[in-house]
Amino acid sequence: LSCAVAIDMATATGRAEWQARAALLTPIAKAHGTDIGCEVSHLGVQIHGGMGFIEETGAAQFSRDARITPIYEGTNGIQAMDLVGRKMQDNGDAAFRLIDEVQRSTEGARATLPDLAGDVWQASEALREATEAMVALPLNDRFAGAVPYLRAFARVLGADAHLKAALAD
């Protein structure tokens, strides 16, 4: 959702910070969403046991349908390389701004949900350190850690979304 909001705001306002955020979030949303879709569909086959491979359950078709999604619009590996390459040409400024935002929301949650807020803070600090390390590397060296970096970023953003949802409850 935050990716869609960033895209809409970038389109509506033309502001550089929204454009940078939309650009940063797009490969994360695409790759993480499709990776999770594959995992969930494979679990669907698994929970059906041997019947998961039988067409009548529908699980095998879901699995086949999901499997192509990490390939559409650039494979997820390419999306990750885009994240650490083109999307970090600003020395990680857009990434650091987003991490700062996560940490501000985490700070606001410490009184109400100290354990969860502490975990999200710790994860966001690890992401900050990974981002600092990533932007310090030459471009070609960044690619080796691109996929794990994208996954870490997605998990921190997901944790932040869950923290905000828990606060709204």
Q: How would you label these PLM feature ranges?
A:
Residues 1-169:
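Flavin-dependent oxidoreductase catalytic core characteristic
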